[in-house]
Amino acid sequence: MKELAGKTAFVTGAASGIGLGIATAFAQAGAKVMLCDIEEAALSAAVEQLRRTNADVDCVKADVSFKVELAAAAEATMARYGKVHILVNNAGVSGGGPYGTWTEASWNWTMGVNLMATIWGIELFGPLIEHHGEGGHIVSTASIAGLISGSSNAYNVSKYGVVALSEGLRRELAPRGIGVSVLCPGFIRTQIMNSRRNLPRRFAEAFRPMPTAGPLAEQVSMIRERVSQGIDPIYVGELVREGVEKDLPYIFTDLEFEPMIEARFAAIK
């Protein structure tokens, strides 16, 4: 999709972080953007921020781990803009933890937000994009952890799933005029390490207390520090805009993990 001006995009997890960076980049390129998030106050603030730049944006609150709420968001988007050209499955949470800390609830929440919401988004918005015959694009946010596993197993599995889904759909949807890209960010300055702020009540038992000392605690502390000093989400948004315009299969934010990715594929050979 070489021209975003006049097109309509739907972005989940858009109240902050990478989602807001993507929404900002799309709006600056002349696209109309429907922002979707579970955090209502932050969502409203993001919309007001963008409207001050004369962007054509609106918002809809949804817990994307509920398919019915995502479906309602799709209906709201069509009612507001009439068409959808770009779907960005960006909402995500950090959950799961290493072996020995798992709970059924933590797996259900992590997979529900990170993977199932992506699947449902494509199921709901794919036909809307295909219907108008003007072409479109789907971007799904995975992670470097979708290519090289870290210590949070449920997170790894969910992000590997997003990568696999995107790779398969790219081949399948190309003849229908729909491009597919997967975003694999590294350390980005977001609130991903504070995902529990949005933990639904039904998953209240999702997390066991984390150790306050030892290797695991040190690793979590390191990740928090890297995230706090991470790449600006606005820059990531620009990379995604470029990725859509150039129909890139993979969108990376930096080259830090390239040697580890190469080592993985060398081991596979």
What are these regions (language model features)?
Residues 122, 158:
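Active-site helix of classical SDR
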